[in-house]
From Swiss-Prot:
V-ATPase is a heteromultimeric enzyme composed of a peripheral catalytic V1 complex (main components: subunits A, B, C, D, E, and F) attached to an integral membrane V0 proton pore complex (main component: the proteolipid protein). Non-catalytic subunit of the peripheral V1 complex of vacuolar ATPase. V-ATPase is responsible for acidifying a variety of intracellular compartments in eukaryotic cells. One of its GO terms (molecular function) is proton-transporting ATPase activity, rotational mechanism. GO terms for cellular component: proton-transporting V-type ATPase, V1 domain. Keywords: Hydrogen ion transport, Ion transport, Transport. Belongs to the ATPase alpha/beta chains family. The keyword Cell inner membrane does not apply. It comes from the Eukaryota. GO terms for biological process: ATP metabolic process; vacuolar acidification. Pfam families: ATP-synt_ab, ATP-synt_ab_N, ATP-synt_VA_C. This is V-type proton ATPase subunit B 2.
Amino acid sequence: MASAEVFKANVEAVTRDYICEPRIEYRTVGGVSGPLVVVELVKRPKFAEIVNIRLGNGTSRRGQVLEVDGNRAVVQVFEGTSGIDNRNTTLQFTGEVLSTPVSKDMLGRVFNGSGKPIDGGPTVLAEAYLDIQGSSINPSERTYPEEMSQTGVSTIDVMNSIARGQKIPLFSAAGLPHNDIAAQICRQAGLVRQKAQDSMIDAGREEEEFAIVFAAMGVNMETAHYFKQDFEENGSMEKTVLFLNLANDPTIERIITPRIALTTAEYLAYECGKHVLVILTDMSSYADALREVSAAREEVPGRRGYPGYMYTDLATIYERAGRIEGRKGSITQLPILTMPNDDITHPIPDLTGYITEGQIYVDRQLHNIQIYPPINVLPTLSRLMKSAIGEGMTRKDHSEVSNQLYDNYAIGKDVAAMKAVVGEEALSSEDLLYLEFLDKFERKFVNQGHYEARTIFDSLDLAWTLLRLFPKELLRRITAKTLEKMYERSES
């Protein structure tokens, strides 16, 4: 070491402040309310700091400071407050925020809602410890999402394409196959790239660049086993990080599960250069946990008992999707929520729709006629689709085909409603053509197998097969140039 460096190190050693404060153990539990513990006479408590809790029987738990009032602190306990008393329970305020270990080795592993391994494997060797609230991102450094992430589901890829870095929720309801759809997207999700000479091919899921972070909140044991077994059997587990918060796990743990999952996704995306798809299910369970904490704190409730700050809280999760200038990776979010009583005006889907960039709507009527996946394309929307498709990204005719499918399907729905009133005999030949399209669209285009992965180009070709039911004059959303190139009636 050079003499100048030695001198500088000595100066720093002499001038460094070595004063530290020892951690104090408190036995001043003032009360317990639901998942919250009130601690009295705390010396300089800090908001959001981690608290180590030791019960009288020797078991340890962790909590986080939610509220500070002078020397009084309100702590939410992640593992629940059962067994905590004011005699034998000791608390230690660490002065640190809640962080989680992250590593590339987390791919292929299963963790609980607190980020601890539950697959019987070894503890992950951390490459970094990151705050679960995430790093603040300068809005000017965000990059507009402009590349498509392929799901293998025709109704999504063709009519509601998802851009890398987009946040788009899946609105479902009790009894609908949203878990099956989520598992299928995990199996089939991949990238689309351009081949030489301006022709497009399917990238076939570039394993080294694509990853999935799956966080389940409030699911039962059967659902958790289904996801785990499905990923392991089809080989997608190698590129998946699985976080499972079960229904019998502490409710309060659901508050941190999506944040731990997103922190892991941020590390994989911005440090490892991967394109990460984050699937969060069920956000309704998360919102219910938020309501439980709010009620325990005796806060003034908002709509249907949910806290008034739920919009802001949901935004802290959804807004962590995106791309950053100078970083190769991206985070695409697909949160899944079940609408209570199929009510899309419920506060959870209502506020989610304000924050996110569209929605995918799972329809009960389609499910009742055995259509899978039962995605209703009419209330479904992807606001960033226009920037993720077209020549050089998918195919030049993509936008026109999508618009024409929407137009014909909407007219077909109107004709079906009119048929129920006036009867089929009163319909014109053109109306009957739209009815035929309506049936074939739902049976052939919307409907596909659980393990049927269609590339975007297969789906576009299938769409053209349906559009050829109509004469060119009725395909008003497609330009004459595109019709001349793509419209070829089969002689059969």
